[in-house]
Amino acid sequence: MEEIKFALDTFYAVMAGALVMWMAAGFTMLEAGLVQKKDVSEIVTKNLGLYSIACIMYLVCGFMLMYPSGGAFGGLLEGYLPAIGTSLGLSTGLPNEEIGMPYGMDYSQQADFFFQVVFVATAMSIVSGAVAGRMKLVPFFLFAIILTGFIYPIQGYWNWGGGFLNQMGYSDYAGSGTVHLCGAAAALAVVTVLGPRKCKYGYDGSVNPMPGSNIPMAALGVWILWLGWFGFNGGSELAVASEGSAIAVSQVFLNTNMAASGGVVAALVLSLFMTGKMDVTMAMNGAIAGLVAITADPLSPSGGTAVLVGAIGGVIVYFSILFLEKKGIDDPVGAISAHGVVGIFGVMAVVVTGGASFMAQLIGVVSIALFTFIASFIVVMVINSIMPIRATDEEQDIGLDVSEIGIEAYPEFK
């Protein structure tokens, strides 16, 4: 029976990871649909590259930084060389007792690594959307190396690796803070250095609309993300081969779906009330906001409570997008609002839905946001001192497809 349970839980972890991996396609389609047509090929290239970089960097160093043998603030040096051997040995196919599990899971270490690495790529995908339309590719990929290999794993250890947040009772089931707030804080740091797209703001500071190139493509991206989120949240139960875990996974799936639905409806109703029209881009961000909001605790609430959590997320993302835009934060896809601002709400909502400690949750969001923002800001400033991270006005005029890639996504449309 133990072998059957091990096999089923391992299979479940791998399949959940595959669903989360498919979210990379969702982010790609969402971003490609919400940017201008002259930047679409660059978006596709960027997402292919960042996913691959995340996988390699997490294998080389991120995994052992996030799950070291001990310490309270991350395995910066402790056990580094032995951990490299363990990490690079993931492909050996040896059983767990011969490889050595980092924290005693009941499925293979290879499955654990795969499930973890797609979360890393998700965090970096959040940055991709926020900097769309004006960041050069090489600096972006250099930043991806540092975020996925070092910044994300260090703060990830604080919670999931047994670090100080875990020890003080911080609760974040699937990563509203650890993944989404981390990605959004990094995105905010990069955007702060990068500045807005050319023509986004008038000389008087007025906001100029820059509509996306393909709304159906963006909507497809949201549907893919919605589907992938069942693996993101459901897989975080880490087991399915017992009656209790099967019921828990079912509840997580239910709540994930209901929260996204609540976010969509809230954003649609609010946009109708505020503008007289239903804004489809706000509805898409409402879905993502609902998903992010419930990610910190998709298990404890009832289905009705999950709808409420998602709806609040939909309201928050609506006003946050407008507020940040007016403050000069140019975020073409609303990633900082949907993943960052709503991520904070999701973590703090666990105080009500899951009975978590208010102070532990507050310290968690502050620690993750500050560390990630400051570290990312420093890294971006260093990269910018070596090479310009921002495309010139002329390059933005012709589009990054031409200036960075050399292949236009829509050559027939001029």
Annotate each PLM feature.
Residues 1-414:
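Hydrophobic alpha-helical transmembrane bundles of multi-pass membrane proteins
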